[in-house]
Amino acid sequence: MGISFSTWRAGGYANAATPRAADPASLQQLGGETMGTTWSLRFDNPRMLPLRAVRDAVQASLDRVVAQMSHWAPDSPLSRYNRASAGSTHLLPPEFARVMACALYWAEASGGAIDPSVGPLVACWGFGPAARAGCSGAVPDPRALAEARARTGWERLAFDPAQGTLLQPGGAEIDLSG
């Protein structure tokens, strides 16, 4: 499984309301690795921007996502938040703050069906970097599952979008991998 991006036109449209058909001569493809998988980009490049520059820009964007929001990277702001003590406030990098605002918007809009605070439940089922002992991917022990449920719920996440700060209520673990 890999990450695939939709067609993107390098250089922009003169009038975005009237896109032109891509010239097959300027369609290009490149790829790389991120998050334990591969990514692929096929795009219309009428200005023939150097492929190395485009690839490096895409890779740098993905690397920023990993550096800020990966629960697999122990030094990421997300991982530090997940390990933090109750009552601590965390200033998020701007990109992470935008993602958090979107995640909480969709959590509310979906009635909690999309919930960025599911880290304890994911771990209880034996997935992710914090997979719990006794939670091996089989049906979890009912006590472990109840404890994980008590630590989840997007409503517990006190996020201030104007300041870009997120309060750790205690035991919350954000997982944006979903």
Identify the meaning behind each predicted range.
Residues 1-177:
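A contiguous, well-ordered beta/alpha segment that forms the leading edge of an enzyme domain
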